[in-house]
């Protein structure tokens, strides 16, 4: 049975609101927000951020086309994007623009609430669901220059009653609709990935079956202006844990960067597009064929940035490991099997973010 223990998303600690801190117009940021050298936006010896390369773009209309040649070309693009980049943008995805506009305005409205209102949705001791910060594992840990609101949306019976049902009505209705649309989009991508991977017919549904009764979590991110952006980080470099993440940029301020061949590349969201990335669990299931990659959020000194990341992960009781038909004498298993997704959730969220350290712990 799925238990409340399995769905406690980590060990959150009470941290001051960065949004409120930014209102103090500080000349210098507190020491807890100063990054280690390797996590600075441009650490000594790092490659210059490349603004000329762009992540691949996948056209969903072509991906689901009834014309075999059109579908095959887009499948090849999807397969290449997952292997070479681990990130891509999707266009012509079918999500109504009015819903996207509501997501943008309602989340902005939430972060515009007074602190007294937002704290009603604050994280409980030992859990990161709610308003606060994620992945704070110790009192001396460097903190991200961001506030978040994290909420589990699927499965329905595991929603926290003190959170979802208490959200302001417009936001609650918007998140409900958005949750449904994101699940539909993610399932299209999972099913097409199966086809692109050309796994054996007996296992052709192995990926989509694992995600059919998915765990879905949303994280709304608020990155306020920072007086010393060169010393801070909005989101520590890391790879995502689960299956697929679908990110929506809520305003025009850029900040997402991905690591590709040792260089940090700024992602410039296309109009009416979503940014999608492969998570650690999907890398494990594809035995390393599809890549989860390090990414981070940087901040600036003048403008706030907002986004919402929707994580699409397996159901809690699914056993996670490489798909057996992808294991051959020439491609032996790279990752261990045997743990359920629920067990891995607890392990992952008990850590601080640290690159791909969790995935590395799963290697054979």
UniProtKB/Swiss-Prot annotation:
Q: What is its EC number?
A: 2.1.1.122, 1.14.11.-
Amino acids binding 2-oxoglutarate: 305
Q: Does the keyword Metal-binding apply?
A: yes
Q: Which InterPro entries match?
A: DIOX_N, IPNS-like_FE2OG_OXY, IPNS-like_sf, Oxoglu/Fe-dep_dioxygenase_dom, Plant_2OG-oxidoreductases
Q: Name one GO molecular function term.
A: metal ion binding
Tell me which UniProt keywords the record has, alphabetically: Dioxygenase, Iron, Metal-binding, Oxidoreductase, Transferase
Stretches assigned to the Fe2OG dioxygenase domain: 214-314
Provide the catalytic activity annotation: (S)-tetrahydropalmatine + S-adenosyl-L-methionine = (S)-cis-N-methyltetrahydropalmatine + S-adenosyl-L-homocysteine; (S)-canadine + S-adenosyl-L-methionine = (S)-cis-N-methylcanadine + S-adenosyl-L-homocysteine; an (S)-7,8,13,14-tetrahydroprotoberberine + S-adenosyl-L-methionine = an (S)-cis-N-methyl-7,8,13,14-tetrahydroprotoberberine + S-adenosyl-L-homocysteine; (S)-stylopine + S-adenosyl-L-methionine = (S)-cis-N-methylstylopine + S-adenosyl-L-homocysteine
Which PROSITE patterns does the UniProt entry name for this protein?
FE2OG_OXY (PS51471)
- Quick one: which residues bind Fe cation? 238, 240, 295
Which cofactor does this sequence's record say it needs? Answer: Fe(2+)
Question: Any other comment in the entry?
Answer: No detectable effect on alkaloid content in RNAi specific mutant.
Protein family (similarity comment): Belongs to the iron/ascorbate-dependent oxidoreductase family.
Q: Which PANTHER family match?
A: OXOGLUTARATE/IRON-DEPENDENT DIOXYGENASE
Q: What does this protein do?
A: Non-heme dioxygenase that mediates dealkylation reactions such as regio- and substrate-specific O-demethylation and O,O-demethylenation in the metabolism of protopine, benzo[c]phenanthridine, and rhoeadine alkaloids; cleaves a methylenedioxy bridge leaving two hydroxyl groups. Catalyzes the O,O-demethylenation of methylenedioxy bridges on protoberberine alkaloids such as allocryptopine and protopine and the O-demethylation of cryptopine. No activity with (S)-reticuline, salutaridine, papaverine, (S)-corytuberine, oripavine, (S)-scoulerine, pavine, noscapine, codeine or thebaine.
Q: Can you say what this protein is called? A: Protopine O-dealkylase
Q: Which organism is it from?
A: Papaver somniferum (Opium poppy)
